Amino acid sequence: MWGETFDDFENDEGEMAMAKQNLIAEPARADFTFAKLPLGIQPVDFMKTHFAETAGKSMQFRKGTTTLAFVYEPATPADKGGIIVAVDSRASSGEYISSKSVMKILDIGDRMVATMAGGAADCQFWTRIVAKYCTLYELREKTSITVSAASKYFANTLYGYRGQGLSVGSMVAGYDKKGPQIFKVDSEGDRCQLKVCSVGSGSLNAYGILDNHYKPKMTDDEARKLGLRAIMHATYRDSGSGGVCNLCHITPTEKIRLPPMDVSKLWYEFADELGRDITYNPVE
Amino acid sequence: MSIMSYTGGTVVAMAGDECVCIASDLRIGEQMTTIATDQKKVHKVTDKVYVGLAGFQSDARTVLEKIMFRKNLYELRENRNIKPQVLSEMISNLAYQHRFGSYFTEPLVAGLDDTNKPYICCMDTIGCVSAPRDFVAVGTGQEYLLGVCENFWRENMKPDELFEATAQSILSCLERDAASGWGAVVYTITKDKVNVSTIKARMD
């Protein structure tokens, strides 16, 4: 079966029709069967009992995040414009920092990414499913999927599990035939298109910087610096966020992943820039 | 989230050869939000005795006032400086008086007695004293600290070694505890002087 092409059925029209049906069928909607709890036990109650804050650290899921993305147009012909996606890298369970180097920008295709906020496992698993769907779509339709379609598939999938305790807050961002686009998708089933967007425990802090300094037209350098700065300030105020800032720039032609930047280092540079004296002098 | 980790914060103390070190972080928060980064949790009681108060900082302030009040009365009555052993007993009594509605703070005492012997102790919210000879820690980073201190502590450390061990221990703790951090302050208490140093830490 594997490795067969249409050439193998060329001679017989009946076989050809059959082969087409078998090989170009639309993939079924991902309907997973997850292990079920015994009858009478509600999944949400079960999770609360065994995985909430009252449980040990190792039983809690990884959470706490700042992620942001925005669309901008090039200010000069020398700039590329597109989308900036910036995220922190901390995973925490309560006040315990379980990882300092999580990659929260997940690839969906060559031109699309999804960000990760909320339950880390939920995000990783479901974006993998979306990525699979997008790849199959591209093979079948011989054209890349739009951000709109991918995010809608994502949102519909999450909606199917609504009320069962999934925790996902993701931004699907990318470039397609319609241009640069960002869709915010969450586990409540919500999906909305935005130009400027931030998700996670530090999102309000990030919005503070973003709303203040965002312009629809920026140079590439300006835009990248804005993303970095918003993440840096969010990690400073929000104890759920920290580590390094991972940044992805999606231009009309390519997807550029920038090297991770230590947010603490960025903060000290920022304080230097201001000339603010940050040395603490205790007084008796 | 528990009230004990509402404001966050960590205090650690280590004993050396005729010297003690006591250190705290500088963060004060409201759950996940950092409010200020210049709040030390270590307070001077006498020249050679310091107290650290971790936990809910509103209660910690109140308790500190009560400690100072009792200590001042003691010194007036006895006309001599209070010893760390006596102070810890006093704080323990104070804490146990609130057995059925305790302050949400864990006190820690570090200092040198009149023979310059180091004394360190910590207690729970209702005054159960434990005074080991090596190191003590209280606050949201207690578990991380006890682990690293076990590795850094050596018998009879001199003041500079002791400072290094304490500073490295608290910095390691701040790497993993989200509720503490944003800088630290270390007090090295020796028989003739107290050395205060602020340490830069990660600001996230």
Curated annotation (Swiss-Prot), chain A:
Q: What is its EC number?
A: 3.4.25.1
Q: Which Pfam families match?
A: Proteasome (PF00227)
Protein location: Cytoplasm; Nucleus
Q: What class of enzyme is it?
A: hydrolase
**Which GO CC annotations does the UniProt entry carry?**
cytosol; nucleus; proteasome core complex, beta-subunit complex
Matches recorded under InterPro entries:
Ntn_hydrolases_N (IPR029055), Pept_T1A_subB (IPR000243), Proteasome_sua/b (IPR001353), Proteasome_suB-type (IPR023333)
Give the UniProt record's GO annotations in the biological process aspect: proteasome-mediated ubiquitin-dependent protein catabolic process
Catalysed reaction, written as an equation? Cleavage of peptide bonds with very broad specificity
Q: Which residues form the propeptide?
A: 1-64
Catalytic residues, per the record, are: T65 (nucleophile)
Where is it chiefly localized?
cytoplasm
Family matches, as PANTHER family: METALLOPROTEASE TLDD (PTHR32194), PROTEASOME SUBUNIT BETA (PTHR32194:SF3)
Role played? Component of the 20S core proteasome complex involved in the proteolytic degradation of most intracellular proteins. This complex plays numerous essential roles within the cell by associating with different regulatory particles. Associated with two 19S regulatory particles, forms the 26S proteasome and thus participates in the ATP-dependent degradation of ubiquitinated proteins.
Give the protein family: Belongs to the peptidase T1B family.
Q: How does it assemble?
A: The 26S proteasome consists of a 20S proteasome core and two 19S regulatory subunits. The 20S proteasome core is composed of 28 subunits that are arranged in four stacked rings, resulting in a barrel-shaped structure. The two end rings are each formed by seven alpha subunits, and the two central rings are each formed by seven beta subunits. The catalytic chamber with the active sites is on the inside of the barrel.
Its name, as the record gives it, is Proteasome subunit pbs-5
What is the source species?
Answer: Caenorhabditis elegans
| Gene responsible for this protein | pbs-5
Curated annotation (Swiss-Prot), chain B:
Could you list this entry's UniProt keywords, alphabetically sorted: Cytoplasm, Nucleus, Proteasome
One Gene Ontology term of the biological-process aspect is:
proteasome-mediated ubiquitin-dependent protein catabolic process
Q: Does the keyword Cell inner membrane apply?
A: no
Q: Name one GO cellular component term.
A: cytosol
Q: Where in the cell is it found?
A: Cytoplasm; Nucleus
Where is this chain primarily localised? cytoplasm
Q: Which residues form the signal peptide?
A: none
Gene3D superfamilies cross-referenced by the UniProt entry: Glutamine Phosphoribosylpyrophosphate, subunit 1, domain 1
Q: How does it assemble?
A: The 26S proteasome consists of a 20S proteasome core and two 19S regulatory subunits. The 20S proteasome core is composed of 28 subunits that are arranged in four stacked rings, resulting in a barrel-shaped structure. The two end rings are each formed by seven alpha subunits, and the two central rings are each formed by seven beta subunits. The catalytic chamber with the active sites is on the inside of the barrel.
Provide the family line.
Answer: Belongs to the peptidase T1B family.
Entry function? Non-catalytic component of the proteasome, a multicatalytic proteinase complex which is characterized by its ability to cleave peptides with Arg, Phe, Tyr, Leu, and Glu adjacent to the leaving group at neutral or slightly basic pH. The proteasome has an ATP-dependent proteolytic activity.
Full protein name: Proteasome subunit beta type-3
This chain is encoded by the gene named: pbs-3
